[in-house]
Structures are given as C-alpha cells and as structure tokens.
C-alpha cells in the first residue's frame, strides 16, 4: 500500500519514477513511520543524534515535530546538526502556565497524529512537551519510545514538574531507553511494562559530534588564557527566588577569593532568572553575562573552562567527557551516578557550601584532578545506534 504523507524517506527506497508529481511518499510495507516530538533545547540536543541515525537508515521514515516551547533555542540546535522540522505546532503564548502548554500540545498533537499515523512516537526526557506527546500517542494507542528513561529523585515535587512528567511517561511507554544501570534498576523496581534497554545517554553522542571540531567561543572582553574560567548555568524552577540570591552571592565570594578566576554566565531568557542574577553580578569586572550560547558555543565554553557550577542535568552528563568537574547547584539530582562516580558534587544553594567546595577545587590540584579524571558514567557515544537497534527489534525488522 502506498500512502502520501509528509514523512521523510530515503530516496533509494522507492523507484524515483513512481514519485513524480507527489510531495513525499513512503512504502508502508517496508518503512517504519517514526515521529520525534520535541519542544525545548535539551530535547533537541539529545534527540538530534537519534534523529540523524534514524534518517540514515533505509528502514525508517521520520517526522520531526516541534511544539514551539523554546523556538529560537531549538532552531539553533537543529541548524548545528543539519536538521529541519517537518511540523511546528507554535503553541507558545506570553505568560502561559503548564496547563496551557499541556492543553495546546495535546490538542495539536492529537490532530497531527491522526493525520500522519506514526507507528511509534519517540520523546525525550521529562519536559511538558514530552509528557503531552506521550499522552497524545497513548490516547491513540501508538507505541511510545522514551529516551532518557528511568531518572528519579523520588521526590514528586523536585524537580517540578519534571519528576512527575518522567514517572508518568514511564507508565505508558513501550520502549524505555535508559542511560545507566541505575536508571534500568529504577524502571524495574517501579514495575513498568515494555522493554527496557540500557543505551547510554544520547547527549554524549551529541557532545562528541560537536566537540570534534573544537568550536570557538568568543566572548567580548574575556581572555580565556588569562583566567581560570568558571562556567555557570542556572535556570531551574526550584532555584527561583531566594536560592538565586544565594547562588549569586556565592559566586561573588569565589571571585573575591580567587583573583585569577572569571565567571561566564549565559543568562536564561526567563526574567525570573535573568533579572536577579544581573542585579547581583552585572557590575563585577570579571563577570561576563551573555545571552544563551548556542550548543556549539556551549561545548566550546565547556572545553575552555576550568570548573562548572550548574543546575543543568545536561551539564552533569556532558562535562565529565571533557574532563571538567561539576558542582551541582541543587539539593538532589536524578543523576546520582555523577556524584557516586566522582565527576560531580552536590552543593545546593547555600552560600557557604558553594564557596567552600569551589574553593577546595580551585586551591587543591589533587582534589581537582580526582574529579577531572573520573570516568563518565553516562556512555560512550553509541546510544543513538543502540536505540535504533532496539526499535528495529521491537518491529522485528
């Protein structure tokens, strides 16, 4: 049966003469229709190598759908990896709530899935987009593949709403792509149905692809050779308000204590994060506040930095592959492998705690090297191919 839909297919699958006058075709009996749904920059980074791997296979027809949750930042990532979206739901509105995002995503995806009839929907992580896409697929009895499955803090409200999102996705997914053995254990203990595959984390695939080119990161006024640069990223909802004030104060103390350091802080676009950090740090001569870096710039910054202070999950996974210690600006983490493996330390948002641990690494070369040389527990850059193999196995192709 030949169906005319907007899935992307490798041209060698069908006789080109049969495609004349038609937009895009796939042969349903030969190709598995896979829909990747994403909305945020972390999803784009972690799904990009997976999408590229599926698009290079003759067995799959792919569709890339954006919800529009982080349009500009997603577009940057897509360009870096040479990808284009097939659909954009454009759901974002000013001052919308989590309910608004979920409602509009569900409505848009319900209509879209009925139109394109994917045989499997692949989502990543724990965003509202991922949850809504999984739920929309479940409502139409479409199998769901969950990339980065099995992360847990065991506190339903921390992080919020991510912990609930990923638990709920796990209850309805048929394919669980777990990055580590601990994630596999979490899924097994929770009694999920479906197949669990330990694949490693796809962010390592993305990181190694970009890092090979040694991407530049030119920051006006920042001399990378003059300072030990501390790279920081802060965005999590749990750190809004007083915790942000404490984080900013700790950064000032570190800069005061170590005159050979500088702070590079790409600011999140959310004013709730952006404004207090600008007020606290904006006047310091060794603080460099920038707009969000695109992914290649971020990788270049990690490569050149000495130490990372971040509440980002991706940073906890990426930095160890580049030999950079991470201080996690949270009280809990769903990536405890980084802590037990010695590549990261939980420092929370207490001023004294952040300052003390950072000072130890900046003053003690042995302590620094112990973290910098620890083995990354999140994989070796082959996760995307392992995911493709698992989907092939699921469909027995």
Where are these regions (language model features)?
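N-terminal subdomain of nucleotide-sugar transferases
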Residues: 26-68
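Conserved nucleotide-sugar phosphate-binding/catalytic loop shared by glycosyltransferases and other
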Residues: 58-104, 108
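A nucleotide-sugar donor-handling region in carbohydrate enzymes
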Residues: 65-67, 71-72, 169-242, 347, ...
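Donor-nucleotide binding loops and adjacent catalytic segments primarily
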Residues: 72-77, 96, 214-304
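An aromatic- and histidine-rich active-site surface loop
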Residues: 122-140
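A donor-sugar binding/catalytic signature common to diverse glycosyltransferases
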Residues: 123-124, 146, 176, 300-339
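A short, histidine- and acid-enriched strand-loop-helix "catalytic/donor-clamping" loop
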Residues: 146-160, 174
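Leloir-type glycosyltransferase catalytic cores
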Residues: 182, 345-397
């Amino acid at each position: 049966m030949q169906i005319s839909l907007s899935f992307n297919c490798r041209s060698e699958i069908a006789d080109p003469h049969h495609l004349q006058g038609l937009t895009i075709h796939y042969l349903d009996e030969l190709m598995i229709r896979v829909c990747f749904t994403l909305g945020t920059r972390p999803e784009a980074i972690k799904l990009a190598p997976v999408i590229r791997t599926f698009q290079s296979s003759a067995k799959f027809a792919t569709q890339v759908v954006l919800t529009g949750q982080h349009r500009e930042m997603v577009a940057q990532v897509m360009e870096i990896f040479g990808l284009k979206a097939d659909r954009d739901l454009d759901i974002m509105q000013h001052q919308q709530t989590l309910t608004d995002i979920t409602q509009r995503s569900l409505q848009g995806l319900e209509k879209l899935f009925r139109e394109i009839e994917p045989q499997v929907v692949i989502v990543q992580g724990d965003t509202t987009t991922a949850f809504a896409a999984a739920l929309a697929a479940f409502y139409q009895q479409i199998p769901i593949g969950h990339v980065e499955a099995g992360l847990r803090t065991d506190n339903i409200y921390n992080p919020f709403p991510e912990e609930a999102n990923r638990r709920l996705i796990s209850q309805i997914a048929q394919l669980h792509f777990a990055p580590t053995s601990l994630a596999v254990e979490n899924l097994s203990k929770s009694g999920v149905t479906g197949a669990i595959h330990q694949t490693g984390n796809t962010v390592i695939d993305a990181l190694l692809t970009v890092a090979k080119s040694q991407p530049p990161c030119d920051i006006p006024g920042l001399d990378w050779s003059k300072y030990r640069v501390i790279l920081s990223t802060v965005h999590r909802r749990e750190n809004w308000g007083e915790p942000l004030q404490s984080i900013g104060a700790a950064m000032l103390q570190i800069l005061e204590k170590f005159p050979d350091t500088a702070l590079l802080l790409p600011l999140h676009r959310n004013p709730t994060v952006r404004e207090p950090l600008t007020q606290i740090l904006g006047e310091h001569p060794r603080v460099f506040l920038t707009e969000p870096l695109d992914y290649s710039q971020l990788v270049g910054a990690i490569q050149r930095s000495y130490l990372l202070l971040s509440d980002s999950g991706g940073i906890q996974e990426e930095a160890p592959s580049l030999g950079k210690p991470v201080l996690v600006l949270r009280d809990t983490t769903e990536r405890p492998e980084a802590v037990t493996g010695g590549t990261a330390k939980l420092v929370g948002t207490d001023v004294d705690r952040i300052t003390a641990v950072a000072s130890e690494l900046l003053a003690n070369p042995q302590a620094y090297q112990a973290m910098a040389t620890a083995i990354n527990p999140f994989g070796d850059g082959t996760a995307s191919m392992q995911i493709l193999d698992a989907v092939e196995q699921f469909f027995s192709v």
